[in-house]
From Swiss-Prot:
Pathway(s): Carbohydrate degradation; 2-deoxy-D-ribose 1-phosphate degradation; D-glyceraldehyde 3-phosphate and acetaldehyde from 2-deoxy-alpha-D-ribose 1-phosphate: step 1/2
Protein name: Phosphopentomutase
Entry-linked PANTHER family: PHOSPHOPENTOMUTASE (PTHR21110:SF0)
Pfam families noted in UniProt: Metalloenzyme
Gene Ontology cellular-component terms listed: cytosol
Gene3D superfamilies recorded: Alkaline Phosphatase, subunit A, Phosphopentomutase
Catalytic activity: 2-deoxy-alpha-D-ribose 1-phosphate = 2-deoxy-D-ribose 5-phosphate; alpha-D-ribose 1-phosphate = D-ribose 5-phosphate
UniProt-listed SUPFAM superfamilies: Alkaline phosphatase-like, DeoB insert domain-like
Cofactor(s), by name: Mn(2+)
Keyword set, alphabetical order: Cytoplasm, Isomerase, Manganese, Metal-binding
A GO MF label: magnesium ion binding
Main location: cytoplasm
Length: 393
């Protein structure tokens, strides 16, 4: 069989479809991002995703199963020990999990913070605890403006987040201290991501995070993107993809300010007509709505993405394949503010794909990476079981 010319892989960040068997171990029993959201609001009609088979994967009020899905469809488990962006995306490109990324539920050790301050030339930091990003700038933003000390916080994920005022502290200075933190937080600390979280405003009533977030990830081992690039193909990264992989295996990268901007950038990448992989992350579902438990905001974002799908599909050539998937769950109806341990959907569509094929429940997100490798005719990483033969015409 001839190789596919292009794969357009869109990660709709945090769109889970039901609790995994071990969800209770993570405090996530009964989580179902799409199912619970649809039920709570009395329906969530996603006709275009439904036509691809989304409603066949879990009960979504308003998006029923269809008898003849237009694409191949299935669900994937997260094999790795985690439920965060890094874990999901790294597994998806065939990176076999080693030790889990470390989390710091009690904040970071004092000696580590002291070394960070020494290297970064800081008198001190504020916070150093688990917190919501929007709440901690309300709590500590005014003190940050008085002292000039950045706000350090973490979450249930393996993240070292640094919030600072974009104008008073300075965006480039914020990026500089985050690069210093990234260098410090390598193994044995093994923090997955250092995240710069700039904000603006004058007091706690109007502090607002800006779109100039920047992620600094651990350096990944060899993975799918390297294989695609080394085969002479393009890897066009949209959104935070380049940050997640520290730029490895990427030939072109563009950051985005919103889902709508991300969809526009996907169109621009499609218009480039370069053979290879377009790899996009649309983060608003997770960042703006999942963590904030905003059911209506999340639902609106899903409706907008569903409405945008036909125009993307219309730009697919006869040798192109569209893949829609997610990296973890983040049920906006659930208690707390953290990600949820869920299965994620995988929907594949295009002229090379057999319609109506149920690929079942995959043991790992790496199965998708192995499948993309086979479709593009590049070597697999050795982690993940390809289902390309099931779905290719």
């Amino acid at each position: 069989m001839a190789a596919v010319r292009r794969v357009v892989l869109i990660v709709i960040d945090s769109v889970g479809i039901g609790a995994m068997p071990d969800a209770a171990d993570w405090g996530d029993a009964g989580a179902n991002t799409l199912g619970n959201m649809a039920r709570q609001r009395g329906g969530l009609p996603l006709p275009n995703l439904g036509r691809l088979g989304l409603g066949n994967l879990c009960a979504i009020e308003g998006t029923p199963p269809v008898d003849a899905p237009a694409g191949a469809y299935g669900r994937m488990a997260i094999f790795s020990h985690g439920k965060d962006t890094m874990t999901g995306h790294w597994e998806m490109v065939g990176i076999r999990p080693e030790a889990p990324f470390r989390t710091y539920p009690d904040g970071f050790p004092e000696d580590l913070i002291a070394e960070f301050c020494r290297r970064a030339g800081l008198e001190g930091v504020l916070g150093n605890k688990v917190a919501s990003g929007t709440e901690i700038i309300k709590e500590l933003g005014e003190e940050h403006l008085r002292t000039g000390w950045p706000i350090v916080y973490t979450s249930a994920d393996s993240v070292f987040q640094v919030a600072a005022h974009e104008e008073r502290f300075g965006l480039e200075r914020l990026y500089e201290v985050c690069r210093i933190a990234r260098d410090l937080l390598r193994p044995p600390h093994r923090v997955g991501r250092v995240i710069a979280r700039p904000f603006v405003g004058t007091d706690r009533t109007n502090f607002t995070r800006t779109a100039n977030r920047h992620d600094y990830a651990l350096e990944p081992p060899r993975m799918l993107l390297d294989e695609v690039k080394d085969a002479g193909l393009s890897v066009l990264a949209v959104g935070k993809i380049s940050d997640i992989f520290s730029g490895h295996g990427i030939t072109y990268s563009v950051h985005t300010k919103s889902n709508a901007d991300g969809i526009e950038k996907i169109h621009e990448c499609l218009d480039r007509q370069e053979p290879g992989l377009i790899f996009a992350n649309l983060v608003d579902f997770d960042m703006l709505y999942g963590h904030r438990r905003d059911v209506e905001g999340y639902a609106r974002a899903m409706l907008e993405f569903d409405a945008a799908l036909p125009a993307i599909m219309a730009k697919l050539g006869p040798e192109d394949v569209l893949v829609v998937t997610a990296d973890h769950g983040n049920d906006p109806t659930y208690i707390g503010t953290d990600h949820t341990r869920e299965y994620v959907p995988v929907l594949l569509y295009g002229e090379p794909i057999k319609p109506g094929v149920d690929v079942g429940t995959r043991a790992s997100l790496a199965d998708l990476g192995a499948t993309v490798a086979d479709l593009l005719g590049v070597p697999q990483t050795g982690f993940g079981e390809s289902f390309a033969d099931q779905i290719r015409k």
